[in-house]
Amino acid sequence: MRREWVAKRQGHANVSQMHYARQGIITEEMDYVAKRENLPAELIRDEVARGRMIIPANINHLNLEPMAIGIASKCKVNANIGASPNSSNLEEEVAKLNLAVKYGADTVMDLSTGGGNLDQIRTAIINASPVPIGTVPIYQALESVHGTIEKLTPDDFLHVIEKHAQQGVDYMTIHAGILIEYLPLVRNRITGIVSRGGGIIARWMLHHHKQNPLYTHFRDIIEIFKKYDVSFSLGDSLRPGCQHDASDEAQLSELKTLGQLTRKAWEHNVQVMVEGPGHVPMDQIEFNVRKQMEECSEAPFYVLGPLVTDIAPGYDHITSAIGAALAGWYGTAMLCYVTPKEHLGLPNAEDVRNGLIAYKIAAHAADIARHRPGARDRDDELSKARYNFDWNRQFELALDPDRAREYHDETLPADIYKTAEFCSMCGPKFCPMQTKVDADALTELEKFLAKQPTGTSV
């Protein structure tokens, strides 16, 4: 779809959506997004130009269907997939991608750390994906030195980053905000550093006693991203890994640096979103969202959860969806899903499904709460179908039609029950929705009530 769009930009030194938006140009991607979001194209251009919205769209990801991440657009959901040295392979990861897209993932991150040739896995995922693909290039950089963190050089990072950009990655997590002077701030934490990429950079700095190479070479990364229109997803290496550590000095110090890096990227017309926690008590979620907006000049916020309690391994898609709904309501632009396997193991296909549906619920609830245009239309349609006992229409409108049909058919599987005016909860005699009050009956009742003395009490 994008081949002709991209061809017109050949030879441009900067091909980012922000670059064109700031020239007053509405790109084909912006126009496509405007139609998807039911928003004016000029509004999309303006939001991208000011940095409050991004359209992750690498010029080499030609089968991409452009989408937007920003407070003016619908709240989005990211799904993480990826092979590990101990589990999964290329075929399984492509299957997870297809499943994630089926259940509504707006973007997908390939977090592969092993399980085969990482370049082949990544390329297969990009070629199969209509949604933006994100990566964490530091993982492959570490693989390139056979896992010996101390051997990593700035050139190792830059080489892998450029390779990912050439392959068509739309956004990359860059852990440039964790500075050497922030490491002592984790001393009093319960869980220390819980970001994989952040942990790699921390160990490198502790060994070499040098500043974060992703920070010192940030301008070099900007130059790569300009050439391919890769968006920054600035990693929160010092995000809290438990309730105790939330909103501490380490987290907020890094956040200030992420804001500085955001504005540095904007100086060169490169798109940015900023990653956030993590594990946060419910009463601190609004503060975290507002603080990010303040420090990062309203760049889109992209949070992992956050989990609102730490005592539910196996159910962290629920503990985190609670926090995600609140974060979305307060203005977070994209939610990174958490699966039931979080903290326990690599998610399988069913875990991906359960995590995604939990997060689609959270994002949709946030859209309704923020009164986004048309956000409640589907709810109203499903409610009408429910009131009219149109079971097939209810299944069709559900976030997970297969699950809705499966649960209904567990007890009433025959086709005749698809038109029945009850389900197995209430049975044929006790369903309150069978009480149809027509307009004539209400008119008669109103006439009767009008004749009654005022102030009548029982």
UniProtKB/Swiss-Prot annotation:
Gene3D superfamilies per the UniProt record, alphabetical: 6.10.250.620, Radical SAM ThiC family, central domain
Binding site for [4Fe-4S] cluster: C423, C426, C431
Cofactor(s) needed by this chain: [4Fe-4S] cluster
Top EC class of this enzyme: lyase
Sites where the protein binds substrate: N80, M109, Y139, H175, S195, R196, G197, D236, S237, L238, R239, E275, Y302
Keyword annotations: 4Fe-4S, Iron, Iron-sulfur, Lyase, Metal-binding, S-adenosyl-L-methionine, Thiamine biosynthesis, Zinc
Cofactor-binding details, from the entry: Binds 1 [4Fe-4S] cluster per subunit. The cluster is coordinated with 3 cysteines and an exchangeable S-adenosyl-L-methionine.
InterPro entries assigned to the protein according to its UniProt record, in alphabetical order: ThiC, ThiC/Bza_core_dom, ThiC/BzaA/B
CC per GO annotation: cytosol
E.C. number: 4.1.99.17
Catalytic activity: 5-amino-1-(5-phospho-beta-D-ribosyl)imidazole + S-adenosyl-L-methionine = 4-amino-2-methyl-5-(phosphooxymethyl)pyrimidine + CO + 5'-deoxyadenosine + formate + L-methionine + 3 H(+)
Pathway: Cofactor biosynthesis; thiamine diphosphate biosynthesis
GO molecular function: 4 iron, 4 sulfur cluster binding; carbon-carbon lyase activity; zinc ion binding
Binding site for Zn(2+): H279, H343
Pfam name, any one: ThiC_Rad_SAM
Biological process terms in GO annotation: thiamine biosynthetic process; thiamine diphosphate biosynthetic process
Function: Catalyzes the synthesis of the hydroxymethylpyrimidine phosphate (HMP-P) moiety of thiamine from aminoimidazole ribotide (AIR) in a radical S-adenosyl-L-methionine (SAM)-dependent reaction.
Family designation: Belongs to the ThiC family.
Name of protein: Phosphomethylpyrimidine synthase
Gene symbol of the encoding locus: thiC
